[in-house]
Design a protein with these regions (language model features):
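Aromatic- and carboxylate-enriched substrate-binding clefts and catalytic-loop regions
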Residues: 1-239, 274-276
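Catalytic core of carbohydrate-active enzymes
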Residues: 132-134, 141-142, 149-160, 173-177, ...
Length: 396
């Protein structure tokens, strides 16, 4: 992997990158490019950054020994960096992966005169803002794909959990990290489905997939192979079913996301956040509410089912099997996908026909499914992309 970012498509590999991006966009693909804010002496921009003083100085006010880190407290650094990214965005790039950022030096002097002791935690916030601002200026929205964050970074979504181990421990830690960042005020979050560090075992990949698709933003990323066809046709078909689960639920995801942004709620929320008066909800760390109506319990270990705590006083209906469960602890067998998904009694969940990409979804073809046990009517939320207005729908 070439870590030397030059903010340009290699001429020997991309004859016409602008046309390539246009062609991809016409097929429903939005391109996201990776980069980082660190520059070694091998990088073509290293001399310029040093000459113009756009880097974080060491504790003696001098050039660091190994590499330079962009200093986002310096307005000239921000201008230089946004110009590089802006050229790519104007070319047709959809988003920028804002990798790293947690490695801001503590023993350092920043352009604003403050030390690393003060600026270390603020570094990812400034980093997130710098990228989000240029994307919003050119695209009208400030979507990024960031790894590091600090208080305030929730204004610049979205963030993902970093390099998870391809183990069951890594899977469990990923679930907990998603719940933790939600409690920290972040609406949206993603993770590397299957883990990152080494090739993911197929059994783990299978269980991680439905969880990954039942988060606000889904992506597969890590040590190769991650493409499903490398695991065989049967796995590819299974991967497609997991993806289609989310695509069918896109009206639910979209409406719940809108409600989250209006109220500051996380899409992935701990049970205690939704049910603070239920003592049992405070003890559960491996389940979550996906929006206000769906409870998700990932299969963190191999098996056909798991124990699930159902909060509140209402009943719950299994999304896959239709079985009804009382609140409290239940052992629940999985349906066709290795994950437990339950719908709160009295919920109406909107669905949409599967499409090749979200651009092609037919929002005039939404259907509603009622989930009723003891309740007499069902309610749900709807938000259409064309008007962005959140509506509460009641179905007798």
């Amino acid at each position: 992997m070439d870590w030397q970012c030059d903010y340009a498509f290699a001429a020997d590999r991309f004859d016409n990158p602008r046309q390539m991006l246009t062609d991809l966009r016409s097929q429903g693909f939005r391109t996201c490019l990776w980069q980082l804010p660190y520059f070694t002496p091998k990088n073509k921009f290293f001399p310029e950054l040093v000459e113009r003083g756009l880097y974080v100085r060491n504790g003696k006010g001098q050039l660091p020994y190994e590499d330079v880190v962009l200093d986002f407290t310096n307005p000239e650094t921000v201008k230089w960096y946004q110009e590089k990214l802006g050229n790519l965005i104007e070319m047709g790039v959809g988003a920028i992966k804002v990798d790293f950022g947690e490695g801001a030096p503590l023993d350092a002097i920043y352009a604003n005169g403050r030390s690393g002791l003060y600026e270390h935690n603020l570094y990812p916030l400034r980093y997130n803002k710098t990228v989000a601002d240029i994307i919003k200026k050119l695209h009208g929205e400030n979507i990024i794909w960031a790894r590091s964050a600090w208080a305030g970074s929730q204004r610049y979504p979205l963030h993902w959990g970093g390099d998870a181990a391809t183990t069951e421990t890594g899977f469990e830690g990923t679930v907990r990290s998603g719940l933790s960042i939600g409690l920290s005020g972040f609406c949206f979050w993603s993770n590397d489905i299957g883990g990152f560090v080494t090739q993911s075992p197929e059994s783990l990949y299978r269980r991680w997939l439905p969880f990954g698709f039942l988060t606000s933003h889904s992506r597969v990323h890590g040590a190769p192979p991650t493409e499903p066809w490398y695991y065989g046709k049967e796995f590819t078909d299974y991967f497609r079913r997991c993806a289609e689960l989310k695509y069918k639920l896109m009206p639910y995801v979209y409406a719940q996301s809108k409600e989250c942004t209006e109220n500051g709620w996380p899409m992935l929320r701990t049970l205690l956040l939704e049910y603070p008066d239920d003592p049992g909800a405070w003890l559960v760390e491996d389940e979550y509410m996906f929006g206000s109506n769906l409870l998700v319990a990932p299969m963190l270990e191999e098996g056909s089912g798991r124990d699930v705590y159902l909060p509140g006083r209402q009943k719950w209906i299994d999304y896959q099997t239709g079985k009804v469960y009382a609140p409290g602890w239940n052992h629940i067998e999985c349906g066709t996908l290795p994950i437990v998904i339950l719908v709160k009694d009295g919920s109406a969940i909107p669905h949409i026909p599967v499409a090749q990409c979200t651009d092609q979804m037919k929002w005039d073809k939404i259907t509603w499914k009622k989930y009723l046990a003891d309740e007499k009517k069902a309610e749900g939320l709807l938000c259409l992309p064309q008007d962005g207005q959140l509506q509460r729908i009641s179905i007798p």
